[in-house]
From Swiss-Prot:
Record key words, sorted: Ribonucleoprotein, Ribosomal protein, RNA-binding, rRNA-binding
Protein name according to UniProt: Large ribosomal subunit protein uL14
Gene source species: Buchnera aphidicola subsp. Schizaphis graminum (strain Sg)
UniProt xrefs under HAMAP family: Ribosomal_uL14
Family the UniProt entry places it in: Belongs to the universal ribosomal protein uL14 family.
UniProt xrefs under InterPro entries: Ribosomal_uL14 (IPR000218), Ribosomal_uL14_bac-type (IPR005745), Ribosomal_uL14_CS (IPR019972), Ribosomal_uL14_sf (IPR036853)
A Pfam family this chain is assigned to: Ribosomal_L14
GO cellular component: cytosolic large ribosomal subunit
């Protein structure tokens, strides 16, 4: 569960290393974001010649959470860290590579580009 002020790892090669959630999108009083939800982030740490710079405010989709996601068969998929993928204004990934595993739940949320770039889909 991601809320405001949560620090996330960035799981793509956009140039950002870490980001902070500043708003959970999808409703006026929505408090938490789960895997597949879109959030507003600010870049907290970036590499020198990346596509994004420190301090930029962008959209991102949550791809991994420590809380995990419950499947219909009762199993729970959990991860060791909270991670997101940076999106542009058209909600397409800024980076061209995705690092680490992602879940099948992104397919339901129409993020097929992220699923095709990911090295492992759980």
């Amino acid at each position: 569960m991601i809320q405001e002020q949560t620090i996330l790892n960035v799981a793509d090669n956009s140039g950002a290393r870490s980001a902070m959630c500043i708003k959970v999108l999808g409703g006026s009083r929505r408090r938490y974001a789960r895997i597949g939800d879109i959030i507003k982030i600010t870049i907290k740490e970036a590499i020198p010649r990346g596509k994004v710079k420190k301090g930029e405010v962008l959209k991102a989709v949550v791809v991994r959470t420590k809380k995990g996601v419950r499947r219909s068969d009762g199993s729970i998929i959990r991860f060791d860290n909270n991670a997101c993928v940076v999106l542009n204004n058209n909600e397409q990934p800024v980076g061209t590579r995705i690092f680490g595993p992602v879940t099948r739940e992104l397919r339901i949320e129409k993020f097929m580009k992220i699923i095709s770039l990911a090295p492992e889909v759980l």
